[in-house]
Amino acid sequence: MYLENINGPSDVKKLTIEEMNKLAAEMRDALLKRASIHGGHFGPNFGMVEATIALHYVFESPEDKMVYDVSHQTYPHKMLTGRKDAYLYEEHYDDVSGYSNPHESEHDFFNVGHTSTSVSLACGLAKARDLKGGKGNVIAVIGDGSLSGGEAFEGLDFASELKSNLIIVVNDNDMSIAENHGGLYGNLKLLRETDGKAECNFFKAMGLDYVYVGNGNDIGALIDAFKSVKDAGKPVVVHIVTLKGKGYKPAEEDKETWHWHMPFDIKTGKPLMDFDGEDYSSVTAEYLLDKMKKDKSVVAITSATPTVMGFTADKRHEAGSQFVDVGIAEETAVALASGIAAGGGKPVYGVYSSFIQRTYDQLSQDLCINNNPATIIVYAASVYGMNDVTHLGIYDIPMISNIPNLVYLAPTTKEEYLAMLEWSIEQNEHPVAIRVPDGEMISDGKKVSKDFSELNRYEITEKGSKIAIIGLGSFYGLACKAAKEIESRTGVKATLINPYYITGIDGELLESLKADHDVVITLEDGMLDGGFGEKIARFYGNSDVKVLNYGLKKEFLDRYDVNEVLKENHLTPEQIADDLSLQ
């Protein structure tokens, strides 16, 4: 095997073109086996194998610095930079993250997981090199829809003024996670159709030199192109056309499904765990499609992650013009939603919690200052969500719940969620965000008659005394378990409260607890600092009521074990009962 003998880029440089092609085949075999067992980003990595080999053959990493956009396509890069064991041997699969990580290797320069940042980061490295009078190439690798993000445009705009070495490799596989959206991709299509010779060339218009490689899976052609731009004295774009999912037929034929994939059977391509039940994504799509048929002013918005709202290709087709994908442009999604709402439409934007960080300014300025009644559905906002350090969904409550005018809701069940969604779409007084519970969807069949227009009204779901437990959103279930544990130990039946609202407090209800409660416990599935519990603690600050806030401490977590994190933060029923006994 060639791959077993690759311990670093210097070993790649010893190979002939024929040997590199054999290496590429071995790398795909290893990637396929690993993905079938471990899951992960599939299509992007299969398409980048040859380009990665060619990059490491031509350039001198780490002296020459490579910055991968999103870095979800760095599996081949890691295989060639001393981390092959994490792809060859099952017992080492978890040795590396799914993204670039400077703690793993000197060949990685940033922790990266969000899109459209590579060109700006690479510009920074190039500027630092120039300030120090250094040499070496700086290479940004960008693709999979990342060019649709605003920061990519900003980076390209700045790059044209660098007047020093910067190489931007545009990996054009004609896909984002789903299909690409935006006028730029029409120009990429034109460039593909004309072998890069079209007069209308976006990159040249930005003031950048341009090289085209029609077969970005041809190692020889790639090596020639990279050699031609190595040590270039000004910024240049190398536009390579690759096949997403190359080498595995199911991935080549269904690029959207195979962008990221759960473990699967290699022969059939079918997932090892087949889930046919409802989840919040599928429920959202079905609800919105029904709503759209009755009301043509309802529109669903995504920023390149349509399936987070359950909008698979067939559902997008069914929705037609009432479904909008703005590309990887969260800022535009929120501003667009605000504009639609201002014009009398009923926009619903679905977004991962980790990605809503990218649009804080638009939430505050374009949406909430104008108090336009758009709906934002926030997914994977939980310790149970994505666990890579770049994709954590636990920071949303402190970040957005303190923006004036915004109403942030936290349902605990399917029924509550749909009731909140219906209210939010039909009301016209506030911008509203809904924090979708993570994990298995709970459906209790109870009809929700609550009118959410009367803001910040909590509900006592079980009346007790002495101890009150407020369980926010997905942690309401933990509140119920903690109450049972406390009662089994002390005989005290705790009062259980579903607060519904993250953005405000129910002063009347909280005041009433003072009469027969000594302790109030808050539980939230997110960061404590600046979070929901602190609002409750502040309310009781000058009283005799003791408040115990439970949530996650302020830190960056990476590839963590959920149960360990919960224990570290005393977020188990037993630990909560233990803490209470010490009061």
Region roles according to the model:
Residues 19, 28-31, 42-47, 52, ...:
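Cofactor-pocket helix-loop regions in the catalytic cores of large enzyme subunits
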Residues 24, 41-162, 298, 303, ...:
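Cofactor-binding active-site loop characterized by glycine-rich and histidine/acidic residues
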Residues 29-36, 97-111, 133-139, 312-327, ...:
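Glycine/charged-rich beta-loop-alpha catalytic/anionic-binding loops adjacent to active sites
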Residues 39-48, 68-72, 101-120, 142-146, ...:
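Active-site nucleophile and cofactor-binding loops and adjacent substrate-binding regions
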Residues 86-96, 161-175, 368-380:
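A glycine-rich helix N-cap at a beta->alpha junction
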Residues 108-264, 270-277, 281-286, 406-517:
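Glycine-rich ThDP/TPP pyrophosphate-binding loop and its adjacent helix/strand module
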Residues 248-357, 362-372, 470-473:
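Non-catalytic terminal/interface segments that mediate subunit docking, oligomerization
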Residues 272-274, 385-387, 407, 527, ...:
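Peripheral docking tails and interdomain loops at the edges
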